[in-house]
């Protein structure tokens, strides 16, 4: 199972939020410094999110994200604020390995098919951010229907993988909620990466045993509740 340290960027800083609330932001320095840190500790993947883009304009922090992509040689997936085909193509053409489409894919599902045909499904990930069983969009401020129905729709449209984020436990460092993860894995055949609540090596092991293809480490990694070494060992 793959492990993705998160590099979440807000106002030019690497941060971690609780439940997607920008008022809860804890700052952890520069995005590039953190990217280099996780790579030096063994990361071969990075999960980069433009939080300003998720809330406002998609161009904010773009240069910092490009720096991470250009100055590292690891697999970088990028999400946050991709609201148009132009945005999506821009990231895919600048060297990002995979993009995550969330609100945009929910508003205009056909873009999944368009981009998968153009760039290959393996580079197109659909974001399934769920709150109380419904997909959450627009910076997790709006609910837009059953998350399983949306996941299956994204798969049918050609998404190569899904990023499932449990908003209800995200950032709380209280462990994962197994039930919705299992429900999602049973409902689709494409790879699912899980974010939200991954706090201990036991969480990583549980996700591996369930059949998740990867997990994202955020708040627990930055606060020291889990080390990257522990997570990588549990994922083997």
From Swiss-Prot:
**Primary subcellular site in the record, as a coarse category:** cytoplasm
Query: What Pfam family is a match for this entry?
Result: His_biosynth
Involved pathway(s)? Amino-acid biosynthesis; L-histidine biosynthesis; L-histidine from 5-phospho-alpha-D-ribose 1-diphosphate: step 4/9
UniProt-annotated location(s): Cytoplasm
InterPro entries registered for this protein in UniProt: Aldolase_TIM, His_biosynth, HisA_bact_arch, Isoase_HisA-like, Isoase_HisA-like_bact, RibuloseP-bd_barrel
Tree of life domain: Archaea
Q: Which HAMAP family match?
A: HisA (MF_01014)
This one is known as: 1-(5-phosphoribosyl)-5-[(5-phosphoribosylamino)methylideneamino] imidazole-4-carboxamide isomerase
What lineage is on file?
Archaea, Methanobacteriati, Methanobacteriota, Stenosarchaea group, Methanomicrobia
Q: Gene symbol?
A: hisA
